[in-house]
Design a protein with these regions (language model features):
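Long, low-complexity segments enriched in small/aliphatic residues
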Residues: 8-60
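Long, low-complexity, intrinsically disordered segments
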Residues: 309-317
Length: 317
């Protein structure tokens, strides 16, 4: 690992412009010194060597399989700016989802977003994976109100809450882990004034331009296409992996790539003409995870305290 870190450090320091040769691919985020999340876990500070000046939220989920590693999906407040995840391996997708959540938290610090409202709403329909679950650790440990979680029985209440908040002006992200497991969304419309599924479809289609982006794991391609086919255009970002070869064209508008390994994914962006491969990060060590969460807990608590004690500009003295 020490050798990998030395090589990664040299690559990060160099202006890596080459016409041939190879680049070391790092499966673990803790080996990548150029990754802002790794820097934050080690130092507890924002990475000051990056050229990030946009207002979008970058997602650090893996490394591009190319000579340059500058590919990071970026969610903005624009129509269609949702991210769709595919894959049948819950553990692997859950690790990727955890990195999405870590990225959103980090970017909220970089962009100095207000902590007055939950940044992330998590609809967690995953099977319990035990105490080492990264998402569970963040929900339990981070300051109250950072991540708001709904389980299977609460999904309809959560959707109604989001509809009420859609025009509130708050920047927020909604993570749906295991969309096709939420059977309550498919209840027949005659029981409700508006079918629950249609409420979610409205949010997916109109949320992003109102500052509400969705990250959705479609754990069943067949069920997703049967029930939510009309929302596919609302996912202009897609991380596609671990599906049948004849299904890739549905999500990437291209044939299945050759030699797809389990840890690799195709990144589809509606604005790009190519579909690059990404090697998704593996689950980090418990030590790395603990350091990241502790540093994030401290940073968010300090941010909340600062905002709470900030003078009200409308007060008269």
């Amino acid at each position: 690992r020490a050798l990998l870190e030395q090589i990664a450090q040299k690559q990060a320091a160099a202006d890596f412009q080459v016409t041939g040769g190879t680049r070391l691919l790092l499966s673990s985020i803790q080996d990548d010194r150029s990754n802002p999340l790794n820097h934050f876990a080690n130092m507890g500070t924002l990475f000051d060597h990056e050229d990030a000046d946009g207002l979008g939220y970058r997602l650090f989920v893996g490394e591009e399989l190319s000579m340059l590693n500058k590919l990071h999906p970026e969610l903005t407040s624009r129509k269609g700016q949702n991210l769709l995840l595919t894959g049948r391996d819950q553990g692997r997708v859950r690790t990727t989802t955890a990195f999405v959540v870590m990225s959103l938290l980090y970017e909220s610090l970089r962009l100095q977003e207000s902590a007055a409202h939950p940044l992330i709403t998590l609809f967690d329909f995953g099977v319990d994976t035990g105490s080492g679950d990264l998402l569970n650790q963040m929900v339990r440990t981070l300051p109250e109100g950072t991540i708001r979680r709904y389980g299977m029985p609460d999904v309809l209440d959560g959707i109604d809450t989001l509809l009420q908040e859609k025009n509130s002006g708050f920047r927020q992200f909604v993570v749906i882990f295991g969309l096709n497991r939420a059977r309550r969304l498919l209840v027949q419309p005659d029981i409700y004034s508006v079918a629950p599924k249609n409420k979610l479809i409205e949010l997916l289609q109109t949320g992003p331009e109102n500052g509400m982006n969705f990250i959705v794991w479609a754990n069943s391609v067949e069920s997703f296409m049967e029930n939510y086919n009309e929302t596919l255009g609302s996912f202009e970002h897609r991380l596609v992996s671990d599906i049948q070869d004849d299904q890739y064209s549905i999500f990437t508008y291209a044939p299945a790539p050759g030699s797809m390994k389990p840890k690799n994914a195709i990144y589809f962006n509606m604005d790009n003409t190519e579909n690059p491969k990404i090697r998704l990060y593996e689950k980090p060590s418990d030590d790395w995870t603990g350091r990241f969460i502790r540093n994030m807990e401290h940073a968010l608590a300090e941010k909340q305290s600062t905002e709470k004690n900030k003078p009200n500009d409308t007060e008269w003295w």
